From Swiss-Prot:
This is 4-hydroxy-2-oxo-heptane-1,7-dioate aldolase. Binds 1 divalent metal cation per subunit. Keywords: Aromatic hydrocarbons catabolism, Lyase, Metal-binding. Its cofactor is a divalent metal cation. InterPro entries: Aldolase/citrate-lyase_domain, HKHD_aldolase_ent, HpaI, HpcH-HpaI_aldolase, Pyrv/PenolPyrv_kinase-like_dom, Pyrv_kinase-like_dom_sf. GO terms for cellular component: cytoplasm. Catalyzes the reversible retro-aldol cleavage of 4-hydroxy-2-ketoheptane-1,7-dioate (HKHD) to pyruvate and succinic semialdehyde. Substrate binds at Q147, A174, D175. A divalent metal cation binds at E149, D175. The gene is hpcH. Signal peptide: none annotated. Homohexamer; trimer of dimers. Pathway: Aromatic compound metabolism; 4-hydroxyphenylacetate degradation; pyruvate and succinate semialdehyde from 4-hydroxyphenylacetate: step 7/7. It catalyses: 4-hydroxy-2-oxoheptanedioate = succinate semialdehyde + pyruvate.
Length: 263
């Protein structure tokens, strides 16, 4: 078993991604052919569940783009279900400290290394037990990315980075800026300083730093600092702004309500 995304991070190869929020396998397959290294299937803020994640994993499977799945919470039951339908790389939201990071890792590992329940006969991940020795290979194929999104998490970053099994740390600019008192303004100098310092610290610890940033100049800046997995856009935003721009070119009045945002 292999995890191409995990291997790329370990090799230090920057991976450029796109956020998927449409919760639809048809659009996921369309975007899987666009040339991004990875696609984030969002179960935290998009209307996804295990079934919709499954259909998107199936739609993406034949393309080079690697799927990353974000559950709605650091919940071992939800994590178990996502792994069973075939997710190998998870982005765990709102991890505040080392204990929560350890819990995330444990949820992705079969015993004795962790607490993942064994149900491989029912699981797409094992191809219904057609993958030889799946139970003994699966742990090494898991890629765990944790999100730090608050001042508390930032203050605990060093101990989070010490947790075995953490492959990368993702900085959440939207929640971080809100927690720092600058909601809706992740480009505030204080927020940017915190983000840049974290990227350098994460990379120095031998882990992969990641972030979502649709501002092209900032995304490139983060890559220069050492970020290794950077999402540079969101499907819903691309569709909404692209449709508005097309309509505007033919005389439609643009509805500006909500047109600007963090991403």
């Amino acid at each position: 078993m292999k995890n191409a995304f995990k291997d790329a991070l370990k090799a230090g190869r920057p991976q450029i991604g796109l956020w998927l929020g449409l919760a639809n396998s048809y659009s996921a397959e369309l975007l899987a052919g666009a040339g991004f290294d990875w696609l984030l299937i969002d179960g935290e803020h998009a209307p996804n569940n295990v079934q919709t994640v499954l259909t998107q994993l199936q739609a993406i499977a034949s393309y080079p783009s690697q799927p990353v799945v974000r559950p709605s919470w650091n919940d071992p039951v939800q994590i178990k279900q996502l792994l069973d339908v075939g997710a190998q790389t998870l982005l765990i939201p709102m991890v505040q400290n080392a204990d929560e990071a350890r819990n995330a890792v444990a949820a992705t590992r079969y015993p004795p290394a962790g607490i993942r329940g064994v149900g491989s006969a029912l699981a797409r991940a094992s191809r219904w037990n057609r993958i030889p020795d799946y139970l003994h290979q699966a742990n090494d194929a898991m890629c765990v990315l944790v999100q730090i999104e608050t001042r508390e998490a930032m203050s605990n970053l060093a101990s989070i980075l010490d947790v075995d099994g953490i492959d990368g740390v993702f900085i959440g600019p939207a929640d971080l800026s809100a927690d720092m008192g600058f909601a809706g303004n992740p480009q505030h100098p204080e927020v940017q300083a915190a983000i840049e310092n974290a990227i350098v610290q994460i990379r120095a610890a031998g882990k992969a730093p990641g972030i979502l940033m649709a501002n092209e100049a900032l995304a490139k800046r983060y890559l220069e600092l050492g970020a290794l997995f950077v999402a540079v856009g969101v499907d819903t935003t691309l569709l909404a702004r692209g449709a508005e721009a097309l309509a505007a070119r033919f005389g439609a009045e643009k509805n500006l309500s909500g047109a600007s945002g963090v991403y």
